[in-house]
A protein has these predicted regions:
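Short, structured secondary-structure boundary patches
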Residues: 1-4, 32, 93-99
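Generic hydrophobic alpha-helical segments
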Residues: 1-2, 39, 83, 164
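N-terminal small/polar loop signature for handling phosphorylated ligands or for N-terminal nucleophile
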Residues: 1-22
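Short Gly/Thr/Asp-enriched flexible loops that form oxyanion-binding sites at enzyme active sites
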Residues: 18-34, 62-63
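Phosphate-binding and adjacent anionic-ligand microenvironments
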Residues: 22, 44-215
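Short, acidic/small-residue loops that bind anionic groups at enzyme active sites
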Residues: 28-48, 77-78
């Protein structure tokens, strides 16, 4: 993006159902950022456009930003399948994942990276704004993600682990903690959001240490 003096660059995954963008400053825009741009650009915020679906991994800052725009925000389980199901259940049109699965129900029934990219670009053209200008209207909460390889995913039910998570949840004024088994790998995934990155990193490291001690 910087080398070519481009306003934006598009990157799709191998099968084309996920997309990320890079803005004119070289910042990588994930699915949360793209969802915000699409929500921001939509003047109709009633009926099928009254809400947005994210997942449990969506940044808390996105939830706050979407709600400030006047939308409802609901979290589905991780996976574009679950986002699509929640959209159908609510009768809404827009949802997606941090990983870049973006679903625009008015254009496609499932995640399509090319469709999502074109929708974002057309939205920015209509706004006559660059990505960074739109995204300056919301702030992400510092987030740390880790994955620990395990032989038994039931570790997430360990009493010591649950006790520690409950303890630190009471210390975090803004943010979230999510511990979940991977749906595709023998791993436990850790996500910690906190007011600053150092706090998030410390808590994530402590949780990882407890899990590793149980393996």
């Amino acid at each position: 993006s910087l080398k070519e003096y481009a306003d934006k660059c598009i990157s799709l995954d191998g099968d084309g159902d996920r997309v990320i963008l890079v803005d004119e400053k070289g910042n990588v825009l994930d699915g949360d950022d793209l969802l915000y741009i699409l929500a921001f650009s939509n003047p109709n915020r009633t009926g099928p456009w009254s809400g947005v679906v994210g997942t449990h991994m969506s940044n808390f800052g996105l939830e706050q930003g979407i709600q400030k725009l006047g939308y409802d925000f609901i979290r589905a389980d991780v996976g574009d399948k679950y986002v699509s199901e929640m959209l159908t259940k609510k009768g809404w049109m827009l949802g997606g994942e941090t990983s870049g699965h973006i679903i625009c129900k008015d254009l496609a029934s499932t995640g399509d990276g090319t469709v999502a990219a074109l929708k974002v670009i057309s939205s920015l053209l209509l706004l006559e704004k660059r990505p960074s200008e739109v995204l300056s209207n919301y702030t992400k909460i510092p987030q740390v993600n880790k994955a620990v390889k395990v032989t038994n995913k039931d570790i997430i039910n360990d009493k010591e682990l649950k006790s520690y998570i409950k303890e630190i949840e009471s210390d975090i004024t803004v943010g979230r903690i999510l511990i979940r088994p991977s749906g595709t790998e023998p791993k436990i995934r850790i996500m910690v959001e906190a007011p600053n990155i150092k706090v998030a990193e410390k808590f994530a490291k402590d949780i990882e240490k407890i899990i590793r001690s149980k393996v």
